[in-house]
């Protein structure tokens, strides 16, 4: 009987959500040993019929790459790797097993929250996140307000939390969830919002930061993609805009900014996960942020949260030239990474995007830096590849807590170095 019930609920769940499943899909960790093997992997990536999803692209020999391989192609890919002498191991045995666990935990948490408080250590739907944002505003009207900066392609509101002690101050911008499947980022942003209101007036650091600067926080930058990743396809990364002349949907919003648009590290193929879109700012989610920042006129720091890899990066990504502010940004990032590490020992790699990961054009912090916002940083949160995008909910709180120390170090520097 119990088994029949489980099967029934499983079928029901799948039916309600028409969830795409990933039964038998594996994530392989691949270690290319030379340039030749990297070339082979890039050719493999280009084979569209294999439907490979590179979670972490092959960049330099000796550096790991991660790829999700659909069940039907697992054998073929392994045979190819072996024939080329490319070392690999299985990072995730069966992706669906992790997804089922994640789903189960969300359902369990939803039941628990009905009779209790909001649990910041769980993944939530967009609706639940919006509700909690409203609660924060209602509970701390003197410190937090909600600013609507636009609507997504599917007409969901893009709501920013504004933390301010009044007056027209210079500001810090912080966003998360520009890539839909990076769930730990939206969760971390929401925890951060709660942390700011809890600690203001108690923690001298955040108190003095907010006495000098406003903070604008956008917890879900890509709401359509987020909803889609929860209801249809957990691996979804892009927006949900319609691309004319293509059956494929969506644009990679972090290749859509007006910074080296259409250059290396972005794809002109609408079916690619890193498709840059028809033109810079074609995505309303990106354009809304650009318009808001331009009209505000006094944003001094632009920080974006991604996952995963444990990196803290600054510009440039679209070119590999050294910034004028390289020394200062490098120092700030090193300091932030040290603060972050002090809590749980989590190690972050620090440097410009181009050298830390790869050349990638059309990214948000390259645009913000070129626009004149000196303190532009991108975090890639936990982990380094045990779970990748499917970070278990039990790691949300430690991730958010340590990230907060890094964020605070950056904000303190911005506070002490007005320009």
Curated annotation (Swiss-Prot):
Keywords noted in UniProt: Carboxypeptidase, Disulfide bond, Hydrolase, Metal-binding, Metalloprotease, Protease, Secreted, Signal, Zinc, Zymogen
Compartments reported by the entry: Secreted
SMART domains xref list: Zn_pept
Catalytic activity: Similar to that of carboxypeptidase A (EC 3.4.17.1), but with a preference for bulkier C-terminal residues
Residues that, per the record, bind Zn(2+): 179, 182, 306
Cofactor binding mode and count: Binds 1 zinc ion per subunit.
Chain positions listed as propeptide in the UniProt record: 19-114
SUPFAM superfamilies named among the record's database cross-references: Protease propeptides/inhibitors, Zn-dependent exopeptidases
Location of the active site: 380 (proton donor/acceptor)
The protein's name in its UniProt record: Carboxypeptidase A2
Lineage start: Eukaryota, Metazoa, Chordata, Craniata, Vertebrata
